[in-house]
Amino acid sequence: METEKIIRLSVRNLVEFILKEGDIDNRISGTLDKDAMLMGGRLHRKIQRMMGSNYQAEVSLKLQLPCDGFQLKLEGRADGILLESEKTIIDEIKGVVRSLDRVEHPVPVHLAQAKCYAYIYARQQGLKQISVQMTYCNLDTEDVKRFREEYTFEELEKWFLDLVHQYERWAKLQIEWEKRRDALIHQTKFPFAYREGQFELAASVYRTIYYKKKLFIQASTGTGKTMAVLYPAVKAIGEGLGDKLFYLTAKTITRTVAEQAFSILEEKGLAFRSITLTAKEKICFCEETECNPDACPYAKGHFDRVNDAVYDMLEKQKKLTRESIERQAEDFHVCPFELSLDLSEWADGVICDYNYVFDPTAHLKRFFADNVSGDYLFLIDEAHNLVERGRDMYSASIYKEDILEVKNLLKDRDKKLVKSLESVNKLMLEMKRECENYRLVESVSPFAIKLMNLLTQMERYLEEERNAGHAEQPDAFMELFFQVRQFLEIHELLDENYIQYTELEGNGRFKIKLFCVNPAENLNHYLKLGNSTIFFSATLLPIDYYKQLLSVEKDDYAVYAESKFPQKNRKILIGSEASTKYTQRGTEMYRKIAEYLRITVDGKNGNYIAFFPSYQFMEDVLEEFEKRSSGVELVIQSQFMSENQREEFLEMFEEERDHPMLGFCVMGGVFSEGIDLTHDRLIGVIVVGTGIPQVCNDREIVKNYFDQRGMRGFDYAYLYPGMNKVLQSAGRVIRTEDDRGIILLLDDRFQNRQYQQLFPREWKEYEVCGRKEIKEKMEEFWKNR
């Protein structure tokens, strides 16, 4: 007998999905949504503590309900349950910035959420009647206003079952799709002949998902890692080991690789709804991304129409491409970005940036806001990027100068807000006087308390301005508003993985920073909501470093997948006469490096790229190169290139030419990873320097943090991030088994064991040479083609 499908859903998602209506208006929801701040926040807890011993706070509630052809498993958390003499009251707490006199009745969605909790609790406890209490608290005055309504169980059941009934047509549509999808997954074969080691890699991925573990994969170019990870994950979904996969990337170009892999599988007969989430600014129909009904016609009435747009796409099994989503948004007159987010709930695979899952200020609330776990599979591509991205996402700063700027903007407009800004500024001034360069601080809690008051005043001011018809506010005000809110959200996360410090920057700006040195714990908060995680990259070395900073588990799996490209197709040389140490820099060294470049490109006509540690270093070498080389076509990366300029740069490598072309690029930039220049489009890469980051306070804090814990602080702060840039840059050449190419490493430090032990296994054959020897080494390599 076939087991009934179980659909898991949070109470919040059910209510918001079925009962959504009205306009998109980020002047309200984008600025005044306090749920994230209140959850676990000071005021929330204060109200709960005041309710006495008969009050149970944060009560987890679950209900599995038989429906037409499936079981609905609902999960949620009631803010509180109050047991009075003969009454049971479900309490839902919401913070507001407007005067409580203007709160005349509960917000329908808030009330519906509380009624769901009341029904679940009454059903489980056998209660004939139960009360629902909506507690609204003004965030400025901390005054409280309550609305209480009593319901019989029969009333609640009728209302609740009607809500579920509205959801049933969606669930049945999804179940039918999944039956078809799973049948075709079972029939879909691996789309290529397995390369050597590729089957074993795919088997490792499937095994990891089966046992609900994490896997770290170091897979060099040529292992076919994308398909070896994606195919077994899709198979696992067909076997019921997951119901949605998130393919997470750091860069747009990597998302294209994932899309191509899905397309290849679909050509082999797979039916799998995959969607790529495009940034709001890129997919927006309007010139300015202003999400409110006054500025955007698609925002007006969006929630009244969007469910019809979603259902139509699902029912007609339209592909969820950017183009089809934009057409559907036009047809139904809805926001294309919000439509794509709604469609992601019904997709089998979501391709998106890291921040949609991990960023506490930008994650997809529909999946990750309520701490409700799901059968998610996380496939994290180019996972070496997640360390720095994680640090950025979980860190926050406030600048004194930004506080002053907003204070001066508003000095004649709102006394209470200006007073709060002055209070914050005064405390920052005291901290600035104690700081020469940077200073570690034991606790910034007194500062955070002042920021809480400031945020409340800013929200009150926004509310009053909007009611007076002045919705638009200066950019400086809104930027500070979001910075303050982010700072307070990050402050809630503080633990032993953080360092708090003040810094007086070289330009005179003073900041207070919450710096997340080790993001593993925060990342794990989201990863534990899924079943399994696969971290993979061509440069995940040393793997223990990444395990330390990306995971908190001690029993994670790890695999090294070696490239099977012929060793004879790769020539690795270390230039013994080059150095990028600061003490060695100068015209003479730039001249030597320029000569290495000239000899390399003279060895064979074709396309080359040289990667440098900085734009300034690149320009210094370029100046010397241009003095000594003619007949070499140059293409140069510039700072702040637009997407069109990047495309034009890469198109230069498509042309056939009878002379050498040399690209001048920066390590760690847009062209040092993710680009795929196969065959003769690129035949040589020169990496200038070890990639070691410049010394700065953040780096020194990382170094000292790990030194104090008995780990190799210099390696964690400088060596490993630097060598990752080197490996990524070098990986731009030799992309297929037929490619041949040169990798020239220009820094005498590459001769040291400290650096060579971080070389991938494929680099075991290398030669050290000066400028005199390099020419014959090149000639010999190209002659033996």
What are these regions (language model features)?
Residues 1-86:
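Metal-dependent nuclease catalytic cores that hydrolyze phosphodiester bonds in DNA/RNA
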Residues 63-157:
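Mg2+/Mn2+-dependent nuclease catalytic core
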Residues 176-218:
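Conserved pre-motif I regulatory segment
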Residues 210-232:
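Walker A/P-loop
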Residues 229, 256, 332-349, 353-459, ...:
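Signature of the SF2 helicase/ATPase Hel1-core->accessory helical subdomain module
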Residues 325-350, 361-368, 461-579, 584, ...:
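A contiguous, basic/glycine-rich beta-loop/short-helix subdomain that forms a polymer-engagement track
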Residues 576-588, 637-751:
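Conserved RecA-like P-loop NTPase helicase motor core
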